[in-house]
Amino acid sequence: MLQNIKHMTLKQLALTMTATILVLSGCAKEMTVNDAVSFLYEYMSIADKGDYSEDFFKANAEVALKARREMPWGKQLNDQLFKHFVLPVRVNNERLDDFRTMYYDTLKARVNGLSMHDAALEINHWCHEKVTYTPSDARTSSPLASMLNGEGRCGEESTFTVAAMRTVGIPARQVYTPRWAHTDDNHAWVEVWTDGKWSFLGACEPEPELNMAWFNEPASRAMLMHTLVFGDYDGPEDVIRRTENFTEINVIGNYVKTRRNIVTVKDSTGNIVTGANVGFCIYNYGEMFPAVTLKTDKNGQASLHTGIGDMFVWASSGGSYGTGLLHTDRAEDCEIVVTLDHNDTEMMDIDIDINPPAPGRIPAEASEAAVAANKLRLAREDSLRLAYTATFTDEVNAAERLGLATEYSDAACKQLIDAKGNWREIREFMVKANDNDLLREGLEMLKTLSRKDIRDTKCDVLLDALISAAKPNFISKNNENIYFDFVLCPRIHGEFLQPFHMDIWNTLAPYIYGNEEANEV
């Protein structure tokens, strides 16, 4: 992994120097695969540099450039749109996979002969055939994992749909409101760039027209909507923050009239405070949620465009804090001064009214005939997806699919059913665990994992963790709960599960066996 990172860092430097020389010499040229890969490596995280090979990113870049050449709308895409909203493989914090390279031909055929606008609508219909909404945990499934199981929460549906749009060269980005202002919870969806402008759609929730979704009215009451753009992006939208890897932008203006909020922070003596933290908070789930935190500039100010509703402000610096309320029902600048007049160990009682934006209207037009036709399509797409999910393991066929005569058959069958589209990998794992006389331990290990883990983890990853946990015979197994939860369990937090356990075991084993201190543990 470290060698891979070092190799790619040196290669990235060489490619960047070459590109700089070409620019300085005035030799503008069409983007090449090397240019595209260089851009990806310039801004990707160190984890992605280590987890995925150069060939992986090269293959994805080749397909992205192919889409730009072959799709009729490719000529509309300038380099900025292409680099930031088509080329990147990553959408959120999902595991990267081969979705783009596997499904380019399929999706290209699906949109053949369509305009860019109609292609975006059609891709969303395809996504609906494959995935529907189901709540789950915070870890984001990859596009192929969502397809495998036919389901995903809104963040996974939107990750999947963005990947599909980008595959055919349609610029797309995942947009989310960190918290609704008028009700609890949040939501994520997709924006697509078609024919010169950004429009929104509900991911895997196709409508007959863009800018139509079940959340049109909720969106009209939102205070903030933002998206993470891969790389150092300099577009027309407000920038919330820049990092080495991405640019966070505010796109609330695409949905509602906005106001500019200006917060000036002063200390208890009236002097402006630079570098203070200013949290712009939305009331949700019984808390003041810091949707955005900014630093004050040299004038002691921080500003943010939002919807037209109340917003609580929390400012802090140097062990002191203060609060304020942004309130106006008009699309005009709203300015307040927050004084840091409380010590951070001091409790504070606050009695305020928080008013969300009033319901508005986001225009969306579709004829009654188009709406009726869309409903028929949705029903057909549901039937296609349900026909696929009907192939998953159930109580009727579980024992036959398992094919093991064991006292643990009931528990093993339950895991096959829970595995949904991943049942073949889980079956292979249990068969191999049984071959190693470790089926009981394997089933206990599966019980430590989330349902999502069961539904997208490969056999080799699970078997690697199981075999390595069974190796150290000096570990006391008298307290099985501790052994199962803290030795056998392959997951630590939200990391990608990888087959690394045996590598570590083979490295450390020579230092452990024969070591009396280790044997006393």
Predicted regions and their residues:
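Short, ordered, surface-exposed loop/turn motifs in non-cytosolic proteins
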Residues: 268-287, 308-310
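Hydrophobic/aromatic-rich core segments of domains that either
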Residues: 29, 109-110, 114, 119-125, ...
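A short, amphipathic beta-strand motif
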Residues: 259-270
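Short Pro-Gly-centered beta-turn/loop motif in secreted/extracellular proteins
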Residues: 301-313, 317-320, 327-330
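Extracellular beta-sheet/turn segments enriched in Thr/Pro/Gly and aliphatic residues
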Residues: 242-254, 327-368
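Secondary-structure boundary elements
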Residues: 29-149, 184-185, 406-521
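C-terminal motif of bacterial Sec signal peptides marking the signal peptidase cleavage site
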Residues: 24-26
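Short, acidic Ser/Thr/Gly-rich low-complexity loop/linker segments typical of extracellular
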Residues: 284-306
